[in-house]
């Protein structure tokens, strides 16, 4: 009978492991191992700078010291990009890194010089939905060939307001949900992580968040229209929170810094338990009102897991501020550890696989 018990246990374990891989849940004991990480390394696992190909050298230095979770790559890029990304991964002190890029199509595609032109979301919505999924998969396969692990797409904003335009599939939430999920599935088919953006909906906001903090329609309007597509994103999709002021929800505070928006609405009400990423905290909507390190503290407190923090030369300052916030009580260790746990699980990194000095 002992043997039977053992078999049952090991079967259960196997099953658990399988489902773990699919949902990317952390391995048992992960929380303890994360709590044992050196503080600077731990806070680094929630930070992603934005760099061009030339800036990947600086990123390699940060990665070698265990101070970042990955990087967002922007233009200019050239034929040496794949090698540059591989060299960053090779020196990382904390395992596989997130290598992300905005490859939406239309006006926002960083790799068109290498991979060719891709239609905008608005143009895609005129094509058969199955073809869109295939095209998204093919593009993501080409991205994987360069070393990318994440596509900061699809845009599931409803409407073509300032800063969005043809980046949105449609003014109709059902069309956005259908095509947005087709793109997300295509990206997943290629083994990359899709990132739906910009929660809770930038499509009908008053301004471009690169310049200033836009105001959306009132929350009850958002619920009926803009929140619809988010409910249809496939499991494994991450969510990027935009910089938006929502009357009746955040009232003048950016959603990316709002506990009500991220933890209250996205996590609790909508039940999202995947990875939450901030839009770039260096954008005018946020940076206009405070510095990036302060914004990073608020964004983590709000419930965001992975922070895009602008240029790589600012990473040390952000990390320092997060350490200070942990020490003075503005940030709870539990919240930081939870974010790190999600990011490492997303990267397929076992936090117990390291020996810290």
Task: Please give the residue ranges for each predicted region.
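Short acidic, glycine-rich surface-loop motifs adjacent to enzyme active sites
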Residues: 61-80, 152, 156-162, 234-252
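Second-shell residues forming the walls of enzyme active-site clefts
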Residues: 38, 80-86, 90-91, 174-331
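Extracellular mucin-like PTS domains
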Residues: 1-25
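Preference for extracellular/luminal or secreted protein segments
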Residues: 25-64, 269, 287-357
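A charged helix-plus-loop insertion that forms the helical arch/lid used to bind
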Residues: 115-128
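Glycine-rich, aromatic-flanked loop segments that form ligand/cofactor-binding clefts
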Residues: 89-116, 132-157, 176, 180, ...
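N-terminal hydrophobic targeting/anchoring segments and the immediately downstream early-domain regions
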Residues: 24-100, 106-113
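Hydrophobic faces of well-ordered beta-strands that scaffold small-molecule active sites
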Residues: 44-51, 69-73, 97-104, 150-154, ...
């Amino acid at each position: 009978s002992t043997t039977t018990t053992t078999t049952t246990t090991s079967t259960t374990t196997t099953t658990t492991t399988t489902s773990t891989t699919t949902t990317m849940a952390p391995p048992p004991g992960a929380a303890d191992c994360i709590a044992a990480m050196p503080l600077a390394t731990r806070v680094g696992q929630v930070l992603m700078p934005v760099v061009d190909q030339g800036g990947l050298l600086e990123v390699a230095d940060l990665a070698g010291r265990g101070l970042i979770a990955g990087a967002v790559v922007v233009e200019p890029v050239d034929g040496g990009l794949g090698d540059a990304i591989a060299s960053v991964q090779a020196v990382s002190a904390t395992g596989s890194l997130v290598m992300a890029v905005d490859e939406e199509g239309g006006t926002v595609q960083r790799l068109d010089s290498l991979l060719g032109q891709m239609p905008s979301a608005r143009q895609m919505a005129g094509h058969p939905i199955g073809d869109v999924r295939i095209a998204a998969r093919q593009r993501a396969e080409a991205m994987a060939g360069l070393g990318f692990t994440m596509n900061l797409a699809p845009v599931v904003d409803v409407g073509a307001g300032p800063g969005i335009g043809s980046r949105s599939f449609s003014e109709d939430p059902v069309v956005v949900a259908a095509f947005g999920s087709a793109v997300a599935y295509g990206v997943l088919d290629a083994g990359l992580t899709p990132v739906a953006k910009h929660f809770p909906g930038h499509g009908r906001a008053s301004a471009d968040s690169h310049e200033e903090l836009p105001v959306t329609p009132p929350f009850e309007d958002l619920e009926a229209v803009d929140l619809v597509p988010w409910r249809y994103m496939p499991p494994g999709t991450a969510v990027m929170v935009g910089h938006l002021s929502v009357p009746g929800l955040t009232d003048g505070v950016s959603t990316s810094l709002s506990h009500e928006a991220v933890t209250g609405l996205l996590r609790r009400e909508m039940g999202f338990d995947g990875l939450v990423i901030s839009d770039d905290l260096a954008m005018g909507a946020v940076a206009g009102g405070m510095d990036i390190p302060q914004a990073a503290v608020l964004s983590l407190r709000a419930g965001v897991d992975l922070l895009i923090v602008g240029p790589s030369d600012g990473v040390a300052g952000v990390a320092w501020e997060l350490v200070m916030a942990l020490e003075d009580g503005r940030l709870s260790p539990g919240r930081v550890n939870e974010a790190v746990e999600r990011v490492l699980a997303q990267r397929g990194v076992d936090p117990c696989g390291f020996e810290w000095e």
